[in-house]
């Protein structure tokens, strides 16, 4: 009778210890806020910096990304080694931390990057993900909804130019 009770206590202790380790690892979980907007291209008509998910070839997609720690505090370039957008075609585009708008007095700070869609890029949905790497080299990935209508989509046509 003593043996099953002792064994049960050992198993319970081991389980609680494992739960504490898991909680400690989860304590490093990051949270993401991100969107896509049309990035300003010289000669092209706006509007720019407005939400979009459909882009024509030669237009520029801009990602605006916030990475938050477990306490909800924003993580800048002193707390993260890198933030990278990885496209399903294999391209990896690094983000930069900074104030926005980039000219003038910043009203917000976040990670951002842009990608100009090549003139010969195929049309259709393009899957992407955001990978944040902390100073210890640990990574965490965020992916947007997997519904095709909400994905980044390259559509046929030419960008509208300024008159």
In which residue ranges do the predicted regions lie?
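Beta-strand-rich domain onsets/edges
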Residues: 24-62, 66-68, 155-163
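Internal, hydrophobic beta-strand segments that form the core of beta-sheet-rich folds
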Residues: 113, 120-146
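Short flexible loop/turn segments that cap and initiate beta-strands
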Residues: 55, 59, 68-97
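Bacterial N-terminal signal peptides
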Residues: 8-17
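Boundary at the C-terminal end of the N-terminal hydrophobic targeting segment
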Residues: 18-24
């Amino acid at each position: 009778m003593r043996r099953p009770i002792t064994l049960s206590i050992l198993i319970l202790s081991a389980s609680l210890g494992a739960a504490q380790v898991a909680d400690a690892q989860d304590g490093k979980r990051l949270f993401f806020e991100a969107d896509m907007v049309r990035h300003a291209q010289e000669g092209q008509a706006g509007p720019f910096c407005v939400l979009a998910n459909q882009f024509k070839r030669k237009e520029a997609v801009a990602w605006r990304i916030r990475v938050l720690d477990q306490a909800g505090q924003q993580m800048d370039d002193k707390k993260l080694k890198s933030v990278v957008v990885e496209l399903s075609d294999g391209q990896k585009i690094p983000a930069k931390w900074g104030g926005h708008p980039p000219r003038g007095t910043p009203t917000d700070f976040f990670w951002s990057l842009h990608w100009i869609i090549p003139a010969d890029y195929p049309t259709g949905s393009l899957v992407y993900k955001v990978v944040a790497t902390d100073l210890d080299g640990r990574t965490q990935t965020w992916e947007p909804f997997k519904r095709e209508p909400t994905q980044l989509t390259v559509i046929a046509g030419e960008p509208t130019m300024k008159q």
